[in-house]
Amino acid sequence: IVLLLRDSEKNRKKFANYLNDPSVKIVWGDLKKYDDVLKCVEGSDYVLHVGGMVSPSADYYPTKTIQTNTTAAKNIVDAVKAQPNKDDIKVVYIGTVAQTGDRNAPIHWARTGDPIKISIYDHYAISKTIAESIFAESGLKHWVSLRQSGILYPDILKNIDPIMFHVPINGVLEWATVEDSGRLLANICEPDVPED
């Protein structure tokens, strides 16, 4: 397991238990730096791209969000293409249900094949849609984009921000837990997952 982590005091504290774990290699770096991404992709069978700028930061820094999320996607695609076994590497990109807009009737629940319908001023969804198109148009043999819902994380109630009013009154809430999201990513890497 190779982790590309932004070098911050918070991340160093959060991942301190893994620093001496021989099964985990931590690369302190930046998704916007190709060489950092390349270090992580070399020798990989799977690339799970779960990093980037997310809301609510995306609302405050829209230009940085678009730059970060699209540059990260391009760097991952380029790093995979640089590998001698590029056709064997499986890439999982985490998109967002925000790419398909608000959940008003008649589209209350997300489904495979929902059209792209970004809500106005949603720079996060714009960045994720552009990044998804980078993977879709990359020519990589094995890639998937999972348009994930919001993530319930332990400190969510400490995050008092106007983003909590983004859900329209007639909309629905679609959430997944941190644990379920991790379980999904782990299961994708199992050998019995079909090629298609």
Located regions from the model:
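Conserved glycine-rich Rossmann-like NAD(P)H-binding loop of the short-chain dehydrogenase/reductase
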Residues: I1-K10
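SDR active-site strand-loop-helix element
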Residues: L4, V47-M53, V91-V97, G101, ...
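NAD(P)H-binding glycine-rich loop region in Rossmannoid oxidoreductase-like domains
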Residues: S23, W28-T68
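Glycine-rich NAD(P)-binding loop of the Rossmann-fold in SDR/ketoreductase-type enzymes
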Residues: K32, K64-N75, I118, D122, ...
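Conserved Rossmann-fold NAD(P)-dependent oxidoreductase catalytic core, especially the SDR/UDP-sugar
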Residues: T71-Y121
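Conserved internal alpha-helix within the Rossmann fold of NAD(P)-dependent oxidoreductases
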Residues: A73-I76, E132, L185
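Conserved beta-loop-beta element that borders a ligand/cofactor-binding pocket
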Residues: E132-P154
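Alpha-helical substrate-binding/gating segment
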Residues: Y153-P154, N159-P162, G171-D196
